């Protein structure tokens, strides 16, 4: 679908009403299987989420700057992310790259997800769990977002898949953050470190429950 949207990117901060709209939209998208036209359209686009990983590689040579609490759990994290590929399949709509800059708060439509270059199908938890670290970076506490994931239908329906996906996602961020900076994107690795830290704080809360 092509449409003209008039508005800014949403505000993910705790004082904004935008996160509530986003979670309501995620609930709507994940509440039922993807319609046949969507499934047909994305049939040739395999989910990149199933290939997310990082902890197993970090386990072979733990980085010196890795938090000691995480270093002590590398075996557990590697085992957890190894379960994700077997859980990565599903029949729900998956945006695949959900961040504030891939959304527009249209003055008439409200929050709308845009840039569906990675659209595919998969379990309901992917987009909601991907968004969770972004909300922590925007100022929400890990404890608040952990409760939200415990309660939201997209992630509460299959908590095992949600935790395994978060493990794979945060491992991916930690691994990539330690690669050489690519030319033309000087702030990328610093951003990846921040989102890795946010995601790991959330993952640790889930693992400790």
Ranges and model annotations:
Residues 1, 25, 98-100, 105, ...:
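Hydrophobic alpha-helical membrane segments, chiefly transmembrane helices and signal peptide h-regions
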Residues 29-37, 84, 139, 177-181:
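A general structural signal marking secondary-structure boundaries and capping sites
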């Amino acid at each position: 679908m092509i449409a003209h949207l008039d508005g800014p990117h949403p505000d993910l901060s705790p004082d904004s009403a935008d996160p509530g709209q986003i979670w309501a939209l995620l609930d709507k998208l994940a509440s039922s299987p993807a319609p046949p036209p969507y499934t047909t359209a994305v049939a040739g686009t395999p989910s990149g989420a199933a290939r997310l990983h990082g902890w197993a590689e970090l386990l072979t040579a733990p980085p010196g700057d890795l938090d000691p609490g995480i270093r002590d759990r590398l075996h557990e994290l590697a085992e957890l992310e190894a379960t994700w590929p077997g859980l990565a399949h599903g029949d729900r709509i998956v945006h695949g790259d959900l961040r504030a800059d891939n959304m527009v708060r249209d003055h008439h439509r409200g929050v709308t997800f845009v840039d569906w270059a990675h659209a595919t199908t998969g379990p309901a938890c992917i987009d909601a769990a991907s968004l969770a670290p972004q909300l922590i970076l925007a100022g929400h506490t890990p404890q608040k977002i952990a409760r939200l994931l415990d309660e939201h239908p997209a992630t509460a329906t299959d908590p095992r898949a949600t935790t395994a996906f978060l493990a794979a996602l945060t491992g991916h961020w930690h691994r990539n953050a330690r690669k050489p900076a690519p030319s033309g994107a000087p702030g990328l690795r610093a951003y990846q470190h921040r989102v890795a830290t946010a995601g790991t704080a959330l993952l640790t809360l889930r693992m400790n429950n």
